[in-house]
């Protein structure tokens, strides 16, 4: 570098050093404009995490408590063994939850995917209102949705039971599926679909061999989201369930009406584990 500078004329050397000085000043000024990490941000982050997840950890720990009271007396699996292995009502509620969650999620995924593909592929009147209307069931309070479904079932003379719970879960899951699949379709390349049509593929062939494979990650995430929402729903299920249609959240609610026990902690721990997995 020194040899190169030595061969330059004085005014060029001065210009070179001036340019380096300007670049350094500009770099320092740009560094000041960049967002800096606020002091204590790590502490705030971990405090928020602690606030959100500390109750869950306490619940998980006390589900293994040997005593019925809040005092820790030792580690034990007794509450899992006694209740899970010797309670047919619990297994029936668990079975109802799983059946309704997976079958309702399948139907909601099918209907929501078809709606998303239809709005993405075709133009029709009031198309712009479809996405707006899909947000309404999501922003309405669950108690409003539950009461409206209860009034509807009573109006059409449909007896409350497993069928009404299944219809309700399918209904409130469709908007979530529609939005997730629509977001995936918006990211896909429309020229691939046009190329398939130009090569002679029919509408059904294009749907099942091009569109569905491109949207498959969104469809899978929508299905899992629907299953999770269905498994944990209580409010809507409370309004539309009938005899023989008790789900796991309803079963837990019926137990805590007589006081919280480690059995409730154990059931809640199982639901948390199922949701996470």
Each PLM stretch: what is its role?
Residues 23-33, 69-70, 77, 126-127, ...:
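Membrane-interfacial helix termini and adjacent extracytoplasmic/periplasmic loops
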Residues 33-37, 80-89, 230-277:
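Interhelical loop and adjacent transmembrane-helix boundary motif
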Residues 29-34, 102-134, 151:
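Transmembrane-helix boundary motif in ABC transporter permease subunits
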Residues 1-46, 277:
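Transmembrane alpha-helical segments of polytopic membrane transport and secretion proteins
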Residues 54-88, 238-243:
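Short membrane-interfacial helix/loop motifs at transmembrane-helix boundaries
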Residues 43, 50-56, 170, 178-181, ...:
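Transmembrane alpha-helices
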Residues 89-99, 154-174, 216-218, 223, ...:
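Loop-to-helix entry region at the N-terminal start of transmembrane alpha-helices
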Residues 53-68, 96, 146-157, 224-229, ...:
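A structural signal for multi-pass alpha-helical bundles of membrane permease subunits
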């Amino acid at each position: 570098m020194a040899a190169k500078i030595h061969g330059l004329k004085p005014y060029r050397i001065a210009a070179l050093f001036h340019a380096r000085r300007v670049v350094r000043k500009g770099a320092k000024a740009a560094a000041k404009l960049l967002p800096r990490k606020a002091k204590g941000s790590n502490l705030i982050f971990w405090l928020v995490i602690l606030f959100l997840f500390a109750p869950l950890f306490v619940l998980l720990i006390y589900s293994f408590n040997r005593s019925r009271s809040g005092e820790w007396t030792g580690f034990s699996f007794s509450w899992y063994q006694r209740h899970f292995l010797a309670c047919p009502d619990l297994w029936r509620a668990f079975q109802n939850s799983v059946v309704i969650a997976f079958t309702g999620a399948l139907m909601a995924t099918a209907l929501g995917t078809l709606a998303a593909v239809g709005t993405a592929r075709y133009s029709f009147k009031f198309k712009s209102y479809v996405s707006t209307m899909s947000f309404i069931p999501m922003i309405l309070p669950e108690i409003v949705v539950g009461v409206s479904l209860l009034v509807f079932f009573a109006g059409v003379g449909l007896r409350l039971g497993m069928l009404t719970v299944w219809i309700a879960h399918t209904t409130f899951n469709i908007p979530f599926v529609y939005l997730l699949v629509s977001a995936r379709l918006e990211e896909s390349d429309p020229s691939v679909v046009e190329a398939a049509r130009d090569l002679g593929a029919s509408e059904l062939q294009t749907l099942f061999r091009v569109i569905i494979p491109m949207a498959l990650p969104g469809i899978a995430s929508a299905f899992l989201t629907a299953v999770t929402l269905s498994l944990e729903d209580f409010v809507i299920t409370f309004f539309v369930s009938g005899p023989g249609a008790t789900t796991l959240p309803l079963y837990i609610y019926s137990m805590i009406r007589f006081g919280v026990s480690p059995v409730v902690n154990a059931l809640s721990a199982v639901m948390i584990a199922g949701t996470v997995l």
